[in-house]
Amino acid sequence: RDRAEGLGVEIFPGFAAAEVLYDERGAVKGVATGNMGVGKDGEPTDNFQLGMELHAKYTVFAEGARGHLGKQVIAKFGLDAGKDPQSYGIGIKELWEIDPARHQPGLALHSAGWPLDDATYGGSFLYHMADNKVVVGFVVGLDYQNPWLSPFEEFQRFKTHPNIRWYFEGDPAKGIQPGKRLSYGARAITAGGLLSLPKTVFPGGALVGCDAGYLNAS
């Protein structure tokens, strides 16, 4: 952040982009942030602050999967014409610190299927980072048919597999300490792949990341 600001980049934390702005030719000319200090009845309060208009020669939309503004731009310019419908998944991720004896820097593991049933798309990842840190996660396609399926519970079941839990379990007899979970999170991802990828440039801007659908789900 400091390097970016040193180069003249302005960062507005806490201000979400709420509206796409267009010029007289219909090209994107920027975005407007949402109004602040609006009551639950929709009326301005004493702390009301009007949103800002941010203009640019080129606006890059990077909101993540099915971004609020990105989907509007896709519809306005017909960017997904002739493409397969986009599909989505939910990815759940945890960051662990594990015993050095179980740490293998640079190791990357991927799996598909288990513990999901044959009708449900999904898979896992496990990456060994620096400083005895491990990132482990599980993705479940959001088109699953079983209404009782819990992606979180499936992730926890995945970690019970002998080849996975070995990294996190302790072994007192060998002086190996159990791992410690440091943080966790979840987010939606695009999973449609190349055939669902819309045109990503349009007058005045571009889509990147999951706003476009760049994730390689394979």
PLM region descriptions:
Residues 3-173, 213-214:
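Predominantly flavin-linked oxidoreductase catalytic cores and closely associated redox partners
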Residues 166-195:
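Flavin (FAD/FMN) cofactor-binding core of flavoprotein oxidoreductases
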Residues 184-215:
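FAD-binding beta-loop-beta segment adjacent to the flavin cofactor pocket
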Residues 218:
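An active-site-proximal "capping" alpha-helix that borders the catalytic cofactor pocket
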